[in-house]
């Protein structure tokens, strides 16, 4: 599984994910809620590890910045997920090469360790 390749602490990431559930859920293909509450502002995060950015089915509110990153080949590797979760706008601006671009995710994790833990948690739910 992809999760086994992630270096963060998934258990610690579950606690950090509580901040993410305002906007995100993790629901499997059968609709079972694995994490989160009712947040649907952002995409369902189930199965995103290892997938192209901006590719969650039935989610049509990706920012132009995220779609530009998708068009440039962004894949949610551990490294990319951690960097994005830590600082979403800085990551997208750097990836796209446009310092003026902004995504929809307003804030990131408190630090890189927390971001790594959240990434590991999300990947562990696949």
Predicted regions and their residues:
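Boundary at the C-terminal end of the N-terminal hydrophobic targeting segment
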Residues: 1-5
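Periplasmic/extracellular electron-transfer cofactor-ligation site
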Residues: 6-10, 14-74, 88-99, 124-126
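C-terminal capping alpha-helices of c-type cytochrome domains
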Residues: 74-126
């Amino acid at each position: 599984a992809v999760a086994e390749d992630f270096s963060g602490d998934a258990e610690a990431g579950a606690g950090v994910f509580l901040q993410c559930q305002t906007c995100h859920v993790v629901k499997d293909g059968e609709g079972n809620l694995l994490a989160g509450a009712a947040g649907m502002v952002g995409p369902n995060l189930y199965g995103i590890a290892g997938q192209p950015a901006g590719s969650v089915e039935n989610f049509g509110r990706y920012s132009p910045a995220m779609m530009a990153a998708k068009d440039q080949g962004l894949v949610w590797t551990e490294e990319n997920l951690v960097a994005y979760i830590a600082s979403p706008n800085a990551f997208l601006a750097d990836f796209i090469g446009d310092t003026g671009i902004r995504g929809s995710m307003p804030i990131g994790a408190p630090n890189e360790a927390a971001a790594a833990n959240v990434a590991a948690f999300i990947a562990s739910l696949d």
